[in-house]
């Protein structure tokens, strides 16, 4: 699963996912096809990993899956049955905010039909609505 090696702060303040459109990372850069978010949400490292596995299993040994997002923020939680107070809980999960129009995954090295099918399978594992886009200038 994806998580940072080191962070400046172990427990960040709670932030809301930004509902504005992304102006960086909103085009297909490395592959031929991409999975672009239509809504915004927090995406967990486990969701990213399950989407990656779904896409790579669909492709087999051909092609590459490129992950364009990384979970930098930790989500803290306290154990079940612990009363309120006595500090903040320990980090449990890692999240990343995904803005509207952010390209989440890219695929290269396969035909358009196989790339679209792999991205469709990966998109169903994510908590955002999505669409499949092609690289500009590639048919």
From Swiss-Prot:
Residues 1-30 are annotated as: Disordered. Residues 1-11 have a biased composition (Basic residues). One of its GO terms (biological process) is translation. GO terms for molecular function: rRNA binding; structural constituent of ribosome; tRNA binding. Coiled coil: none annotated. SUPFAM superfamilies: Ribosomal protein L16p/L10e. InterPro entries: Ribosomal_uL16, Ribosomal_uL16_bact-type, Ribosomal_uL16_CS, Ribosomal_uL16_dom, Ribosomal_uL16_sf. GO terms for cellular component: cytosolic large ribosomal subunit. Gene3D superfamilies: Ribosomal protein L10e/L16. PROSITE patterns: RIBOSOMAL_L16_2 (PS00701). Part of the 50S ribosomal subunit. Binds 23S rRNA and is also seen to make contacts with the A and possibly P site tRNAs. HAMAP family: Ribosomal_uL16. Belongs to the universal ribosomal protein uL16 family. This is Large ribosomal subunit protein uL16.
